[in-house]
Amino acid sequence: MSYTIPAQTRTEIGKGSSRRLRREGKVPAVIYGVGKEPVSIVFDHKDIINIQANDDFYTSVLTIVLDGKEVNVRAQAMQRHVFKPMIDHVDFVYA
């Protein structure tokens, strides 16, 4: 199955800005890979919470629409809130 997630590039980096984003219902994330610069991104929590419940989310190639450009990635790691059904951060790897 194909998954598409709209995202924007993050300009503010750090714990404080990540907390502000989470309060607004957004998820900070990073895309990295060999030979490419890491890119900090942010997307809406509602865009990923339902698709990550599918079993093939972690093994399939995802498409992130980053500022109008499509990037193919795989989910590498996901940090979740301790007791709330929320995602705190996602690491993606270039596919």
From Swiss-Prot:
Q: What does this protein do?
A: This is one of the proteins that binds to the 5S RNA in the ribosome where it forms part of the central protuberance.
| Quaternary assembly | Part of the 50S ribosomal subunit; part of the 5S rRNA/L5/L18/L25 subcomplex. Contacts the 5S rRNA. Binds to the 5S rRNA independently of L5 and L18.
Keyword Ribosomal protein part of the UniProt annotation: yes
Write out the GO cellular component annotations. cytosolic large ribosomal subunit
One Pfam match, given by its short name, reads Ribosomal_L25p
Keyword Ribosomal protein in record:
yes
Cross-referenced PANTHER family: RIBOSOMAL PROTEIN L25/GLN-TRNA SYNTHETASE, ANTI-CODON-BINDING DOMAIN-CONTAINING PROTEIN, RIBOSOMAL PROTEIN L25_GLN-TRNA SYNTHETASE, ANTI-CODON-BINDING DOMAIN-CONTAINING PROTEIN
Family recorded in the similarity comment: Belongs to the bacterial ribosomal protein bL25 family.
Q: Which InterPro entries match?
A: Rbsml_bL25/Gln-tRNA_synth_N, Ribosomal_bL25/Gln-tRNA_synth, Ribosomal_bL25_long, Ribosomal_bL25_short, Ribosomal_L25_dom, Ribosomal_uL5_bac-type
What residue intervals traverse the membrane? none
**High-level lineage:** Bacteria, Pseudomonadati, Pseudomonadota, Gammaproteobacteria, Alteromonadales
- What is the primary gene name for this protein? rplY
In Swiss-Prot or TrEMBL terms, this protein is called: Large ribosomal subunit protein bL25
The record's keywords, sorted A to Z, are: Ribonucleoprotein, Ribosomal protein, RNA-binding, rRNA-binding
Q: Which GO terms describe its biological process?
A: translation
